[in-house]
């Protein structure tokens, strides 16, 4: 049985993609698979209830009127995120599905009672470290240029939650029209930097910090998706058992590609991702300014086109899965300059699968696949010689089928 954030199209991102692909492959390998995820807040009732919603090989159930999802800006009201519930509802659900093991992909939206009931029933629990929610109120552990993974205190939670939305507003995003609401978020006013507002956030997060630490203590095995994520978790948790298991998904496969870089007058250097500080977008712009324009072309993908960028940066905006081959055909060097301690980073494997050379920040978990020459601590370390000397990587990509076999073996040994 899996607990995940949800399914496409209502939820997106690497966590959702990975958990869905893993479940589908487990079904293909003959396993019976159940999925539980947070659902909408019912308007006509506040009663917490679990309902079976459909079955397409995976039996899917949803938690209605569960805990709020801290999808934006941290946690404003700590008490709302540790509300007690009827543990009997979880017990009835677990009795019905009778899982051999529970695989947890996130702590968002799930009550502590789920874990206490599972332990009472003797069900083993494994946890994949997709992000840092629970260790912190922000999945990234990062705000305004600072990673808080080494400074995790009550005051840190206050600072990380200075831009938090109200619980009522967060619950709006648990409706099925969430994707539309997400598009509208850019029109909603939010503070971008911590200022004197920090003095106004006097919430006490100590009990919530202990609440999540107790939940983590119920995990029988941690599946760390990189050395980096293991380092962050081990610094903030005690007495855990786990191992590094690099993740995959159904789109990661070795492709036969032609090296077009020799046919070009200039190497094409690109950034793929949101135009956000934590992803290193502005670091990429710094790099562009530092490199000679007569020797390199620059491009960005994966976010809305910006009006204020110089015309020597080609902006291709967002793209869909069908276009992905054409995207990578036009990239020689991909820069992955994340500032947050990114637990993995599927974009690295994706690029490598297309034969694209990757230069990644030390903050990217998937740097585990790169030679040290392709890893940088600061964007200023990258120069013309660094790019020309960057190494192409030859390595065996694990398919989702192979990865699933590995995960099932871990289940059997927990």
Language-model features: where?
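N-terminal subdomain of nucleotide-sugar transferases
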Residues: 1-55, 121-124, 286-292
